[in-house]
Amino acid sequence: MKKHTDQPIADVQGSPDTRHIAIDRVGIKAIRHPVLVADKDGGSQHTVAQFNMYVNLPHNFKGTHMSRFVEILNSHEREISVESFEEILRSMVSRLESDSGHIEMTFPYFVNKSAPISGVKSLLDYEVTFIGEIKHGDQYGFTMKVIVPVTSLCPCSKKISDYGAHNQRSHVTISVHTNSFVWIEDVIRIAEEQASCELFGLLKRPDEKYVTEKAYNNPKFVEDIVRDVAEILNHDDRIDAYVVESENFESIHNHSAYALIERDKRK
């Protein structure tokens, strides 16, 4: 066994690099960590998030200190919100002695929903991503991305068929760059209200009849969904920029239908 000595251990990451090439993003990816996320009902949800954490690296340094990313994450075990997300990002940039940083936090988020007729309650899960970025030492930007599962029913199929119409589950993905607070639930409702019908975790027979007929009476192409969502986002002053996507997992094809609208309202 080697004896312990007081001699300093070499800091290889902090040594100079002679290639003179800066790195835009370096850090850790796909690390899981338990978090508390605030919900609109005044409570909080215990969940597990997957983090990607990066900083930029100047051309004159060989490497970054990977262990510090984990230390920063472990030091923030309290409730994570839009506001505290900025604090974590600034802490990372400061600790890693960088002027730019990027954090992505992806987690399942649950909403307790009531069935439309019976009122029976059940949970439905959504995939949410918080994205925070600091550029040039001070410029902070926050984006929230929510993937909302919905039902879409084809207008063409309804029009040309003597009875019935093909329908399928779809994903409406909304990414919003905000200037003030927006609840996750607010984004979910925007997507669900513009679909042919929303989804529920549990339905009784009267509920199933209702959602089937609602979708049939509200047919939407992917083009309709993204345009209808974009129209709502265009009139929401809390949102500076957005990307809205719709992907229909076609029930009569072995491919998806897809549409996207991207707008920066500041330009």
Curated annotation (Swiss-Prot):
Could you tell me the keywords of this UniProt record?
Hydrolase
The record's EC number reads: 3.5.4.16
Q: Which pathway does this polypeptide act in?
A: Cofactor biosynthesis; 7,8-dihydroneopterin triphosphate biosynthesis; 7,8-dihydroneopterin triphosphate from GTP: step 1/1
Q: Which reaction does it catalyse?
A: GTP + H2O = 7,8-dihydroneopterin 3'-triphosphate + formate + H(+)
Query: Site positions for May be catalytically important, renumbered to this chain?
Result: C154
Show the GO MF annotations: GTP cyclohydrolase I activity
Q: Name one GO biological process term.
A: tetrahydrofolate biosynthetic process
Query: Mind telling me which Gene3D superfamilies this protein's record contains?
Result: Urate Oxidase (3.10.270.10)
Pfam families in the record:
GCHY-1
In terms of HAMAP family, this protein maps to: GTP_cyclohydrol_B
Family statement drawn from the similarity comment of this UniProt entry: Belongs to the GTP cyclohydrolase IV family.
Q: Sum up the protein's function in the record's words.
A: Converts GTP to 7,8-dihydroneopterin triphosphate.
List the PANTHER family hit by this protein, alphabetically. GTP CYCLOHYDROLASE MPTA
Identification of the protein by name: GTP cyclohydrolase FolE2
Record the organism: Nitrosomonas eutropha (strain DSM 101675 / C91 / Nm57)
Q: What is the lineage of its organism?
A: Bacteria, Pseudomonadati, Pseudomonadota, Betaproteobacteria, Nitrosomonadales
Gene designation: folE2
